[in-house]
Amino acid sequence: MRLIQPIFASYSTRDTGLGEDNKIFNAWKEVNERVKKDMDLGVKEFLLFYIPEYKLGEKADTHRGNEGIDSHKFDQVCVTAASLARDIQPQCRLIVDVCLCSYTQDGHCCIVGDQEKTDKLLAMSARDIYTASGATVAPSDCQDNTVKNIRATKGGGIDIMSYSTKFRSTFYRGWRNAMKIAKGIHRPYQLDVHDREGAINRSIKYSNDGANELMVKPGITSLDLIKPIKEATGKPCGAYQTSGEWLGIGAPGSLEETYHIFKRAGADYMITYGARRLARHHRQ
Protein backbone atom coordinates (compact mmCIF):
# COMPACT_ATOMS: atom_id res chain seq x y z
CA MET A 1 0.00 0.00 0.00
CA ARG A 2 1.42 3.35 -1.09
CA LEU A 3 1.69 6.29 1.31
CA ILE A 4 0.73 9.80 0.19
CA GLN A 5 1.66 12.86 2.27
CA PRO A 6 -0.52 16.01 2.05
CA ILE A 7 1.37 19.29 1.66
CA PHE A 8 -0.19 22.71 2.32
CA ALA A 9 1.27 25.65 0.43
CA SER A 10 0.46 29.36 0.41
CA TYR A 11 2.13 32.75 0.37
CA SER A 12 3.23 32.56 3.99
CA THR A 13 3.99 30.03 6.70
CA ARG A 14 1.45 29.44 9.45
CA ASP A 15 0.09 26.75 11.71
CA THR A 16 -2.70 24.41 10.59
CA GLY A 17 -3.58 22.83 13.91
CA LEU A 18 -2.56 19.48 12.43
CA GLY A 19 0.88 19.40 14.05
CA GLU A 20 4.23 21.01 13.27
CA ASP A 21 4.95 18.56 10.46
CA ASN A 22 1.75 19.63 8.70
CA LYS A 23 2.03 23.41 8.87
CA ILE A 24 1.33 25.55 5.83
CA PHE A 25 4.59 26.11 4.00
CA ASN A 26 5.65 29.15 2.04
CA ALA A 27 5.13 28.09 -1.55
CA TRP A 28 8.35 29.60 -2.84
CA LYS A 29 10.78 28.95 0.02
CA GLU A 30 9.86 25.85 1.99
CA VAL A 31 7.87 23.33 -0.02
CA ASN A 32 10.83 21.98 -1.99
CA GLU A 33 12.84 21.63 1.21
CA ARG A 34 10.00 19.75 2.95
CA VAL A 35 9.53 17.43 -0.03
CA LYS A 36 13.23 16.62 -0.16
CA LYS A 37 13.27 15.76 3.54
CA ASP A 38 10.22 13.54 3.13
CA MET A 39 11.74 11.77 0.15
CA ASP A 40 14.83 11.04 2.22
CA LEU A 41 12.48 9.30 4.67
CA GLY A 42 10.98 7.24 1.86
CA VAL A 43 7.83 9.20 0.99
CA LYS A 44 7.43 9.25 -2.78
CA GLU A 45 3.99 10.75 -3.36
CA PHE A 46 2.51 14.07 -2.25
CA LEU A 47 -0.95 15.65 -2.40
CA LEU A 48 -0.68 19.43 -2.79
CA PHE A 49 -3.29 21.82 -1.41
CA TYR A 50 -2.77 25.39 -2.54
CA ILE A 51 -4.27 28.18 -0.42
CA PRO A 52 -4.67 31.52 -2.24
CA GLU A 53 -3.71 34.71 -0.46
CA TYR A 54 -7.27 36.04 -0.82
CA LYS A 55 -10.60 34.50 -1.62
CA LEU A 56 -11.63 35.38 -5.16
CA GLY A 57 -13.48 38.68 -5.26
CA GLU A 58 -12.50 39.45 -1.67
CA LYS A 59 -11.39 42.94 -0.63
CA ALA A 60 -10.83 44.20 2.88
CA ASP A 61 -13.64 46.75 2.65
CA THR A 62 -16.34 44.67 0.95
CA HIS A 63 -18.88 42.13 2.12
CA ARG A 64 -18.29 38.42 1.60
CA GLY A 65 -19.80 36.84 -1.47
CA ASN A 66 -18.87 35.16 -4.74
CA GLU A 67 -20.02 37.95 -7.05
CA GLY A 68 -16.44 38.89 -7.85
CA ILE A 69 -15.25 35.46 -8.94
CA ASP A 70 -14.14 35.44 -12.57
CA SER A 71 -12.26 33.12 -14.86
CA HIS A 72 -9.27 35.41 -15.35
CA LYS A 73 -8.49 35.80 -11.66
CA PHE A 74 -9.07 32.12 -11.01
CA ASP A 75 -6.73 31.24 -13.86
CA GLN A 76 -3.98 33.33 -12.26
CA VAL A 77 -4.32 31.39 -9.00
CA CYS A 78 -4.22 28.07 -10.83
CA VAL A 79 -1.12 29.06 -12.75
CA THR A 80 0.60 29.91 -9.47
CA ALA A 81 -0.26 26.46 -8.12
CA ALA A 82 0.91 24.88 -11.34
CA SER A 83 4.23 26.72 -11.17
CA LEU A 84 4.81 25.29 -7.72
CA ALA A 85 3.87 21.83 -8.97
CA ARG A 86 6.31 22.13 -11.85
CA ASP A 87 9.16 23.00 -9.51
CA ILE A 88 8.86 19.85 -7.40
CA GLN A 89 7.34 17.42 -9.91
CA PRO A 90 10.63 15.99 -11.27
CA GLN A 91 11.58 14.68 -7.83
CA CYS A 92 8.43 12.73 -6.99
CA ARG A 93 4.87 11.93 -7.92
CA LEU A 94 2.88 15.06 -7.26
CA ILE A 95 -0.91 15.06 -7.04
CA VAL A 96 -2.70 18.42 -6.98
CA ASP A 97 -6.13 18.81 -5.40
CA VAL A 98 -8.69 20.45 -7.69
CA CYS A 99 -11.67 22.14 -6.05
CA LEU A 100 -13.23 25.58 -5.57
CA CYS A 101 -13.77 25.53 -1.80
CA SER A 102 -10.53 27.31 -0.86
CA TYR A 103 -11.21 30.03 -3.47
CA THR A 104 -14.91 30.75 -2.94
CA GLN A 105 -15.89 33.00 -0.07
CA ASP A 106 -18.85 30.86 0.99
CA GLY A 107 -16.68 27.72 1.19
CA HIS A 108 -18.69 25.71 -1.31
CA CYS A 109 -16.99 23.36 -3.76
CA CYS A 110 -19.00 24.94 -6.57
CA ILE A 111 -20.46 28.28 -7.63
CA VAL A 112 -23.90 27.85 -6.09
CA GLY A 113 -26.58 28.29 -8.73
CA ASP A 114 -24.16 28.37 -11.67
CA GLN A 115 -23.19 24.87 -12.75
CA GLU A 116 -21.86 26.03 -16.10
CA LYS A 117 -19.35 28.36 -14.46
CA THR A 118 -18.45 25.69 -11.90
CA ASP A 119 -17.69 23.19 -14.64
CA LYS A 120 -15.64 25.73 -16.57
CA LEU A 121 -13.49 26.77 -13.60
CA LEU A 122 -12.78 23.22 -12.45
CA ALA A 123 -11.83 22.01 -15.92
CA MET A 124 -9.64 25.08 -16.44
CA SER A 125 -7.86 24.52 -13.14
CA ALA A 126 -7.06 20.90 -13.96
CA ARG A 127 -5.97 21.83 -17.48
CA ASP A 128 -3.58 24.54 -16.34
CA ILE A 129 -2.05 22.44 -13.56
CA TYR A 130 -1.46 19.50 -15.88
CA THR A 131 -0.20 21.62 -18.79
CA ALA A 132 2.31 23.45 -16.61
CA SER A 133 3.53 20.51 -14.54
CA GLY A 134 2.34 17.12 -15.75
CA ALA A 135 1.09 16.46 -12.21
CA THR A 136 -1.77 14.11 -11.42
CA VAL A 137 -4.96 16.07 -10.77
CA ALA A 138 -7.32 15.08 -7.96
CA PRO A 139 -10.82 16.57 -8.31
CA SER A 140 -12.44 16.62 -4.87
CA ASP A 141 -15.47 18.78 -5.70
CA CYS A 142 -18.08 15.99 -6.04
CA GLN A 143 -19.70 17.64 -9.06
CA ASP A 144 -21.27 15.39 -11.69
CA ASN A 145 -19.31 16.59 -14.71
CA THR A 146 -15.79 17.31 -13.45
CA VAL A 147 -13.97 14.07 -14.25
CA LYS A 148 -15.69 13.80 -17.62
CA ASN A 149 -14.83 17.40 -18.49
CA ILE A 150 -11.19 17.03 -17.45
CA ARG A 151 -10.86 13.90 -19.55
CA ALA A 152 -12.49 15.62 -22.52
CA THR A 153 -10.24 18.67 -22.14
CA LYS A 154 -6.90 16.87 -21.94
CA GLY A 155 -7.64 13.45 -23.40
CA GLY A 156 -5.84 10.28 -22.37
CA GLY A 157 -2.60 11.88 -21.24
CA ILE A 158 -3.77 13.35 -17.95
CA ASP A 159 -3.77 11.19 -14.81
CA ILE A 160 -6.90 11.65 -12.67
CA MET A 161 -7.23 10.56 -9.04
CA SER A 162 -10.88 11.11 -8.18
CA TYR A 163 -12.30 11.64 -4.70
CA SER A 164 -14.94 9.31 -6.04
CA THR A 165 -16.76 8.26 -2.86
CA LYS A 166 -16.70 11.26 -0.54
CA PHE A 167 -19.18 11.57 2.31
CA ARG A 168 -20.52 14.56 4.20
CA SER A 169 -18.68 14.17 7.48
CA THR A 170 -17.61 15.76 10.74
CA PHE A 171 -14.14 14.28 10.19
CA TYR A 172 -13.01 17.19 7.97
CA ARG A 173 -12.91 19.87 10.65
CA GLY A 174 -9.12 20.23 10.96
CA TRP A 175 -8.58 20.45 7.22
CA ARG A 176 -11.27 23.09 6.79
CA ASN A 177 -9.69 25.18 9.54
CA ALA A 178 -6.31 24.93 7.81
CA MET A 179 -7.79 25.95 4.46
CA LYS A 180 -9.80 28.84 5.99
CA ILE A 181 -13.07 27.37 4.75
CA ALA A 182 -16.36 28.48 6.25
CA LYS A 183 -17.94 26.14 8.79
CA GLY A 184 -21.47 24.80 9.04
CA ILE A 185 -22.16 24.53 5.32
CA HIS A 186 -24.46 21.81 4.05
CA ARG A 187 -22.94 20.27 0.92
CA PRO A 188 -25.68 18.23 -0.76
CA TYR A 189 -23.31 17.11 -3.53
CA GLN A 190 -21.35 15.06 -0.98
CA LEU A 191 -22.70 11.60 -0.14
CA ASP A 192 -24.96 10.64 2.74
CA VAL A 193 -23.16 8.19 5.01
CA HIS A 194 -26.25 5.95 5.07
CA ASP A 195 -26.23 5.43 1.29
CA ARG A 196 -23.99 2.41 0.61
CA GLU A 197 -25.35 1.72 -2.88
CA GLY A 198 -25.06 5.37 -3.90
CA ALA A 199 -21.50 5.50 -2.57
CA ILE A 200 -20.42 2.55 -4.70
CA ASN A 201 -22.30 3.84 -7.74
CA ARG A 202 -20.60 7.24 -7.45
CA SER A 203 -17.19 5.60 -7.82
CA ILE A 204 -18.46 3.54 -10.75
CA LYS A 205 -19.68 6.74 -12.44
CA TYR A 206 -16.36 8.55 -12.04
CA SER A 207 -14.53 5.45 -13.23
CA ASN A 208 -16.68 5.39 -16.36
CA ASP A 209 -16.06 9.12 -16.80
CA GLY A 210 -12.32 8.46 -17.04
CA ALA A 211 -10.76 8.49 -13.56
CA ASN A 212 -7.57 6.43 -13.31
CA GLU A 213 -7.71 5.97 -9.53
CA LEU A 214 -10.59 6.06 -7.06
CA MET A 215 -10.88 6.98 -3.39
CA VAL A 216 -13.04 6.66 -0.29
CA LYS A 217 -13.17 9.50 2.24
CA PRO A 218 -13.22 9.52 5.25
CA GLY A 219 -11.02 6.46 5.35
CA ILE A 220 -11.77 4.66 8.58
CA THR A 221 -15.56 4.90 8.15
CA SER A 222 -15.52 3.77 4.50
CA LEU A 223 -13.18 0.77 4.46
CA ASP A 224 -16.05 -1.63 3.76
CA LEU A 225 -16.54 0.04 0.37
CA ILE A 226 -13.04 -0.45 -1.04
CA LYS A 227 -13.43 -4.08 -2.10
CA PRO A 228 -16.81 -3.68 -3.87
CA ILE A 229 -15.58 -0.53 -5.63
CA LYS A 230 -12.46 -2.30 -6.91
CA GLU A 231 -14.49 -5.32 -7.99
CA ALA A 232 -17.03 -3.16 -9.83
CA THR A 233 -14.48 -0.96 -11.62
CA GLY A 234 -11.26 -2.95 -11.90
CA LYS A 235 -9.38 0.19 -10.87
CA PRO A 236 -7.17 1.05 -7.88
CA CYS A 237 -8.99 2.50 -4.88
CA GLY A 238 -7.35 4.17 -1.90
CA ALA A 239 -8.48 5.81 1.31
CA TYR A 240 -7.99 9.28 2.77
CA GLN A 241 -7.31 9.34 6.51
CA THR A 242 -8.88 12.73 7.14
CA SER A 243 -7.82 15.50 9.48
CA GLY A 244 -10.45 14.49 12.03
CA GLU A 245 -9.15 10.92 12.02
CA TRP A 246 -5.58 12.17 12.29
CA LEU A 247 -6.34 14.46 15.21
CA GLY A 248 -7.91 11.52 17.03
CA ILE A 249 -4.73 9.47 16.86
CA GLY A 250 -2.77 9.92 20.06
CA ALA A 251 -1.86 6.62 21.66
CA PRO A 252 1.56 5.13 20.81
CA GLY A 253 1.26 2.73 17.90
CA SER A 254 -2.20 3.90 16.85
CA LEU A 255 -1.06 5.37 13.52
CA GLU A 256 0.72 2.14 12.62
CA GLU A 257 -2.41 0.21 13.60
CA THR A 258 -4.59 2.24 11.25
CA TYR A 259 -2.03 1.70 8.48
CA HIS A 260 -2.44 -2.06 8.78
CA ILE A 261 -6.25 -1.75 8.94
CA PHE A 262 -6.31 0.25 5.70
CA LYS A 263 -3.96 -2.26 4.10
CA ARG A 264 -6.06 -5.20 5.31
CA ALA A 265 -9.14 -3.62 3.72
CA GLY A 266 -7.41 -3.68 0.34
CA ALA A 267 -6.58 0.01 -0.06
CA ASP A 268 -4.06 0.57 -2.84
CA TYR A 269 -2.89 3.80 -1.25
CA MET A 270 -3.38 5.71 2.00
CA ILE A 271 -3.40 9.49 2.15
CA THR A 272 -2.46 10.46 5.69
CA TYR A 273 -0.94 13.42 7.52
CA GLY A 274 1.26 10.82 9.19
CA ALA A 275 2.81 9.46 5.97
CA ARG A 276 6.24 10.83 6.82
CA ARG A 277 5.97 9.41 10.34
CA LEU A 278 5.02 5.99 8.98
CA ALA A 279 7.83 6.10 6.42
CA ARG A 280 10.31 6.91 9.18
CA HIS A 281 8.97 4.05 11.30
CA HIS A 282 9.16 1.57 8.43
CA ARG A 283 12.78 2.51 7.70
CA GLN A 284 13.70 1.88 11.32
How should these model regions be labeled?
Residues 2-4, 10-284:
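Alpha/beta enzyme core
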